Structure formats: structure tokens, C-alpha cells
């Protein structure tokens, strides 16, 4: 797994008291959804952890629901902006987004969109609206788009990361499922290369089959 470095900010009330670099390992990523899951290499439990909106609550979202976006606007330290949901399913390049009018600008990308009353994570800020004006562009910071929560669940399920929302699942079970999937996929590819068909009941390795030929 690739290792990355992240910056974690600590607060005392509304004041940032420290900003610490922390390493982490990329568990999974998806270029289509522009999402990644990172496991932090830390021994200190993070005090505040957001919960993803429950899957059965997604259809209960309404235009006008209060929301907050948070991110490092124009490389500033993280700060929140309030607004409301203005469109529940905007399709851009065949991908679904929520639209909100909480001001967002370059630097907010990847920051969370949170429900204003429930505190749920709804998505990640992904796009802003721009208008071409001559040789420049005008940014409509009040027309921001965030990853639709259904896409979060598509990512979690495809990557076997159900433990992020299911209390009956756990990290170690998820890692075993991911390992099993990779093994089965590799086995199918190798068998296909040998002109053989995978048999679910057959536990022999492709190497053993090759030796039998």
C-alpha cells in the first residue's frame, strides 16, 4: 500500500493550537469517483470523527437543508462555510453530485460537506461553477458541487470497506475480503491466459494446473 502524508489540525475552541503531519497508507482509491480511503499510522485516537449519512436517510435530504462545507480555501487554514442544499442530483460527466450554495473555492476540494443539523458527512467538495469572461474566468463560489452520498456507498461496497458504516463489520474482515478478491481475480486472469476456465469448486493453483499440462 502506498504511503502518504497528511496534515491534522488540533483546535482549542475556535483556535488552531497545532498542525501535525501524519503518515497514512492508501487502502483503496477510485479514479472515477475521485475518492480514496486512508489508514492513519497514528497511536492517538482522533477525538472527532464524522459519520457518513445512513444509506436509508439519503432519500430524506431536501432542498433547503442546512449544510456546512469545510476546507483550506485558497490555502488558508481550514474553516467552515454555511449554506443550504440547492439541488439533490446534478449529473456532470455521468456522475452524480449534490449542489449547495455554501461558498467554496479552490482549496476546498476534498473537504467535507456536512449536514447542518445531523452532522452527517454527505460528500466531498469536488467542483465549482466558472464562467468564461474574455481571457479570464469568474467563479460562482455559491454554486458548488459535492460527491453524491450514493457514490460514497458505491465506493465503500466495491472496495469491501463496509466497516466504515456497518457496526457488524470490522477492518480485519474487510482486509481479508479484499485479499480474497485480489487472489480470485489473479487466479482467473492466469487461468484465462492458460486457456482454462475457472471452477469455483477447484482449489488448485494456476501454477499446479500449468504443471499438469
Protein language model annotation of sequence segments:
Residues 25-27, 41-76:
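Active-site substrate-binding loop(s) of clan PA
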Residues 1-31:
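Catalytic-histidine neighborhood of serine endopeptidases
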Residues 20-22, 33-36, 63-65, 81, ...:
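Envelope-exposed proteins and targeting segments
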Residues 41-51, 77-160:
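Active-site region of chymotrypsin-like
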Residues 14-21, 74-82:
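Short coil-to-beta-strand transition motifs
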Residues 1-11, 121-213:
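C-terminal cap/linker of serine protease catalytic domains
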Amino acid at each position: 500500500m502506498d504511503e502518504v502524508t497528511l496534515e491534522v489540525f488540533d483546535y482549542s475552541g475556535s483556535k488552531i493550537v497545532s498542525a501535525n503531519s501524519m503518515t497514512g497508507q492508501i487502502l483503496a482509491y477510485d479514479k472515477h469517483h475521485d475518492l480514496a480511503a486512508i489508514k492513519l499510522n497514528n497511536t492517538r485516537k482522533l477525538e472527532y470523527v464524522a459519520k457518513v449519512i445512513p444509506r436509508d436517510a439519503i432519500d430524506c435530504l431536501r432542498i433547503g437543508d442546512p449544510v456546512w462545507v469545510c476546507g483550506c480555501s485558497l490555502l488558508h487554514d481550514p474553516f467552515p462555510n454555511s449554506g443550504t442544499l440547492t439541488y439533490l442530483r446534478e449529473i456532470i460527466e455521468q456522475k452524480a453530485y449534490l449542489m449547495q450554495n455554501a461558498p467554496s473555492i479552490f482549496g476546498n476540494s476534498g473537504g467535507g460537506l456536512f449536514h447542518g443539523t445531523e452532522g452527517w458527512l454527505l460528500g466531498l467538495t469536488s467542483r465549482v461553477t466558472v464562467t468564461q469572461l474574455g481571457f479570464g474566468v469568474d467563479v460562482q463560489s455559491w454554486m458548488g458541487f459535492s460527491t453524491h452520498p450514493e457514490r460514497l456507498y458505491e465506493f465503500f461496497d466495491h472496495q469491501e470497506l463496509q466497516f466504515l458504516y456497518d457496526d457488524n463489520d470490522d477492518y480485519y474482515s474487510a482486509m481479508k475480503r479484499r485479499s480474497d478478491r485480489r487472489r480470485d481475480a489473479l487466479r482467473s486472469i492466469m487461468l484465462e491466459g492458460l486457456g482454462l476456465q475457472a471452477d469455483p469448486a477447484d482449489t488448485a493453483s494456476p501454477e499446479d494446473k500449468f504443471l499438469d499440462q
